Amino acid sequence: MHRLVERADSTTTISPATTYGKWEGWGVSLAWWAAAFGDQDDLADIFFSTDWTTFNGVSIPGLGFNVVRYNAGACSWNTAPDGSTMVVSPDMISTRQMDGYWCPRTDLSTASSWDWTVDANQRAMMTKAQSRGVNYFELFSNSPMWWMTTNHNPSGNDDGSNNNLQAWNYDQHAIYLASIALKAKSSWGVTFTSVEPLNEPYDSWTGDTGTQEGCHFDRDTQNEVVIYLRNELNSRGLSSILVSASDENTYDQATATWNSFNSTGQASVGRVNTHGYQYGGGDRVALYDAVTASGLSVWNSEYGEDDATGEQLVSNLILDLIWLHNTAWVYWQALDGGGWGLIDADVETGTIGDVSQKYYVLALFTRHIREGMYILQGGSDYTVAAYDSSAEKLIIVAVNWGSAQYINFDLSEFSQGGVDGALVKRWSTQIGSGDQYANFTDTYLSGTKFWSYFDEDTVMTFEVDNVVI
């Protein structure tokens, strides 16, 4: 039991004075891993429920994701009426070729123009996710269908810094995505919350020798495409589905792209998405300010890195919650090798390895900061806080990077900062190795304060009941 004598090397005061909107959720993209493993119920339990699941002989706490991003593929292996076929990058990784539904250059209205049987595994995982409570679904595109591109290569233009969507296919790309959204609603039982027609569009990493699908769009073209998509969704009775944009690679690119859109383009967008690959850099505040000035919210719709220890994840996630004020956060590859996956896996061979330490770091956020909570000011650069108004519960997640120390948490700015002497539940994960979502019942409130001893490189989550703003 932590002694009821105040002791701390650091103190942070949680403030309810400012809230940053309701938290919408945590999630994961389904491409590419679900195309390989989409038939596995245990993976669906692990990612989309908060149940404990036995996996490879180990009991794993479910992450409780409630957001999925479903990828509209760009690849097909049939021949167009003019005899053309898809051009495949010499460096393309086969498991990153996602099946597309629209047959090349065929009439939109005929049933034979669409092959709705492909991509069964990714759809299966989306359905499993829905049955486990997922309630935000985003349809996104890495590239238009290959036959809409200038070089028939869904990895990108021969020059990765040039547009690869043919000008006369801007609307066709929008039609493709809107048609999938309509099919999902009418036949799959899934209503997409949003549709994103772009993926890191201003970057130039895409190209004809790429290892994955990708397509460069200059900013004027992006503006046109989101307008087309808004109109195509509306024409199909899908006006409640948001258009999201632009999933730029970095925060700074996202700000520049958003500010470049004209009034019609901005009015067509219902939410701004960014990726988190600027990591510890970039001006998150500028993006937040630009987006909120337009009355919208921002998602970090894709984050990933190769650090299996969890150090980068917790550092960058805390930066997002403190400065970007995103209302959702989505991880890229749930299963992958080289440290990228939350679970180590070789998608090419279909083999699955161990759960990474960063999985357990992420669990400290996803299992406790839940949809509908309000993000508060944590009072320091190592603390984030969320408040559940219906349960009158405060969630605190904090990390200690330096030498082992006591950290004191001060709740005196709340009208009721818990109940003196009450138990504060806590969970702990150590970065790199050590504790993996370990649960402790040894921490108690002393007035409106409590403290805990943090080893070096340790992340903890605390739940405090009977807190009133």
Q: Residue locations for each model-derived region?
A:
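Carbohydrate-binding surface patches
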Residues: 378-420, 457
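Solvent-exposed beta-hairpin/edge-strand motifs
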Residues: 414-435
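C-terminal beta-strand-rich structural cap/linker in extracellular carbohydrate-active enzymes
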Residues: 441-469
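Structural recognition of the beta-strand scaffold that forms the well-ordered cores
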Residues: 22-30, 66-72, 76-79, 136-140, ...
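N-terminal catalytic cores of secreted or lumenal carbohydrate-active enzymes
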Residues: 9, 14-192, 227
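Fungal secretory targeting signals
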Residues: 1-7, 469
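Active-site neighborhood of glycoside hydrolase catalytic domains
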Residues: 172-191, 201-306
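Aromatic/acidic polysaccharide-binding cleft in carbohydrate-active enzymes
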Residues: 295-369, 373-381
